[in-house]
């Protein structure tokens, strides 16, 4: 895993720009809440929204924003969807935060659904394939409840995950709106502090929990404190890999790794390919 000294390095200044005094947390929250309320109204989603609650940072922030935008009682449904690799503490953290927000919430164990699917699928020992199946089962359960309750599905991916493709296509990437799509992971954490998300969730390592001991940063191979300044330079500032590396004082190979993730995952951010109009 890449480990960099942020105490005096150039990228620390970029990170500070993203999450420090230049990041107006109150204004950002108000803007996103206005977006949520307006989108739900325009869609005539009488039931409000349904959010998948993982017990992690992103879903906690999205749930809090939705509760503030729509009012907690009845218009926000939080679904906690544990699988075989979901720690009990995640379920408990998600439920406790939902109660704190005053939103309706339910816990549905999706493992029987995943297991039934595996019984009729080829017996292949591939944890990523099974993990992606798990994510897509969660999406299906969210949309089931959305349809029944006349709700929209509020996605919980952030700009870091979307940019590098760290989500399952038609799984956790499937949503009607993604309130924090414009915020990098480090910014979401700062917004979480403003929204008074519990400390246990704020400090928890990001993980989709698709298999045992699964954490995002271990799978990616670097921290979001490293990824976000690089993405800012590549995506927002439109710098080349060489320019970004020079500006941040990081190895060019590290920048190119992030750049490669962005390029390789472009299909995840696009509509399905179709032939030219005949």
Regions flagged by a language model, labelled:
Residues 58, 184, 198, 223, ...:
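Helix N-cap / loop-to-helix initiation motif
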Residues 111, 186-189, 242:
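Residues in well-ordered alpha-helical elements
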